[in-house]
Amino acid sequence: MKKKIKIIGAGPTGLITALNIVNKSDFEVELFDAQETVGGLAASVNIDGMICDWGPHIFHSAHRDITDFWLKNFGDLLVKKDFFYKNYKDGIYYDYPISWESINKFPKNIKKKVEKEINNLKPENLMRARNFKECVVELVGPTLQKIFFEKYTEKLWGLSPEKMSPNWAPKRIELRKKHKAFWSGQFSACGKYGAGAIMDRMAKTIQEKGGKIHTKHRLKKINIIKNKISDLHFENGKNYKSDDSIVVSTIPLNNLCKTMKLPCDLMFNSVRLMYMVFSKNRIFPKNTHSIYFAHSSFDFHRASEQKQYSDTTFPKGKSIIVFEISYTQRKHLGTMSDKELSKRILKQFCSLGFVKKEDFLSAQSVKMPNVNPVMKIGYEKELSKINSKISKVDNLHLAGGSAEFIYGDIQTMVARGNDMADLLISNHYAINKNLKRSLQFKFNENVEIYGHKIGLNHPTMVIAEIGINHRGNLEAAKKLVLEAKKSGCEIAKIQTYKGKDRVSNTSKEAKYADKTLGMEETT
């Protein structure tokens, strides 16, 4: 009997997982998605023949296998180019990410203050940071933190940086000497006809190879019998027997919990995209693709000119600005009509001098209630509690950023989809330690580590976890080893790495980390 895989969510992770499975096995694969089209957050919208993404999506990677995947399968649908962003602050457009060129634009007194703070940074203080704000202060100093991070972070996530987990803060912030492309040194491209065209091709290939895709299927309820999903119930009234299937969820974790009647206090940020059409050939300066706005006087936190990403579907004399508006806490921005909100946005945008009121042609919006996880201080406890309950369901797996409650862009979703598919089709699926087991097996009752026997009838061994590389401070590492010994620990565990990267560039974890943003550390 063929193994059956049911995937909830036909976004990038779901599509990549399914594509790999149909390419490498004869398994029966079905995808279910709530929307009319596939793609999830990487879908596109057609506005009078002009194709726009649900917020610009970049296909970038420093990993050759991911780059080769894009080029081999979708090369004709990609526009390879560099992308440049700006940060608006008090009438001045600074480079994003921050560069010394931008810092040199500061008034002399502020510039000297920034230089002094950066010169006095102590890397070892980063490990003591208790929240997002303290992390950023230890990376760039209090002045740059206040100018570029504090207000923007609160505006985007609807949460004060002091209340956000240090795990969500960048692990490093590169201060470039000169303004470079955002993904400088990496392959980077955008969709020639929008990211949605690439998602559509994946879906078509899956179907051509026997996979099934069910759109307009929003998951309503999951029945679980004896720690196994027995049935999937959808809002359209259709039900699917699943006790003979492996179910992979890629939908937001809070939504999955709702279908399983699990309490969940985890939160995602909500973003409304406002597409505004203007009678101008180009609106932003050339090679300015997106601009970030921290000021509370602007409802939007980012504005992007889709035509500068790809102009293939755009006529002369027209362009579209995509405004990203977080309404996680500013609920009124999520409930306004398109007419009311676009009127506000137009007035704010005109004040910047890019357009005049008479240039405006039309507007429409789309709401995305679950974009990225909001990592409040202490979220780990809630996440651990939920994962412990979900892990008891033998035939359920989670894959992707929303499902695993982690940050991730398209390149990381490709890596996670690849890995999930490889694990599912592995001959060792039933006993692989990274997966739930559908068959019972016994662990070793006794093991030996460095001459210490561990297991039944042996004393408990205590291993001290003393950290990773200690910022290159060998003396600090030695002191921790000695303290571990004094505390009665049998073994002290220390991890090291060389160069700029924590792990090999080819390892699985390395592909999960966005090294440009520094939002995830590799282990």
PLM region spans:
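N-terminal Rossmann-like FAD-binding beta1-loop-alpha1 element of flavoenzymes
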Residues: 3-31
